Amino acid sequence: NLAGSGCIRANGGAGYWDGFAGPGGGGGRGAVTLTGADSFGSVAIQAYGGEYPGPTYDGAAGSVYLRTQGQGASEGLLVVDNGGRSPNRTTDISSNVTGTAVGSVIIRNNANLQVNSNQSVTVGGNWSNTAAFTALSNSLVTLSGTGTAAVFGSHTFERFVCTNGGKTVQFSVGHTNGVMKVLKLTGESGNRLLLRSVSPGQLWLLKADADAVQTVDWVDVQDSDARPGVAISALNTVGSNTYNWSFAAAGVTNAWV
């Protein structure tokens, strides 16, 4: 359990050499797991980048991973928060990072979460971005599990995948989610993947690049505007209030006897 109202900090420091201020250090990587409670109470937990006297050389945000007593190792909350520092440095998911499957993600306060080339992040719950997200070549974001998830904010993904029939994925209104290389959204017969707006009746925006490989099958989509990109070609899919979506049935095999 955590008690009190203090602050746990893993903030980066500002470097000084020979009286001159160096760029701020990156925030640390912290994790807190509760074994007897489901609330972190009033305790603040930070991993901000170090500050620099000038406007552009603050350090990158670190990360904080929070788990309550009932959450498994990959069910916690990943927070990437830079405390309003300058947004010029990235918090990288690189090949050196372990534990890239999480429950939910929050990116905020001038943080910039970057998934490096050929790296991946798997998220079972919500993805909330009010700061910045960078996807390098061939990086992958996967939405896992069957519980309802929401994607808040605008993003440009390299590869974006959800293959969980029965799952509902909601998207925020007024934000665009772009996909550059792979868009894979699939449910299964009798158990479609549901794509919805966070605000029913209001459009969420999808932008598929012309070079993106699309696999969209057994989906139920509502309130989606794909006109920012190329048309979405979907098999075995139903939809309402959609724009730039093309619905088709799977091919039928004729047997001659």
Regions found by a protein language model. Give the residues of each.
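Sequence/structural signature of small/polar-enriched beta-strand/turn repeats
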Residues: 1-166, 172-257
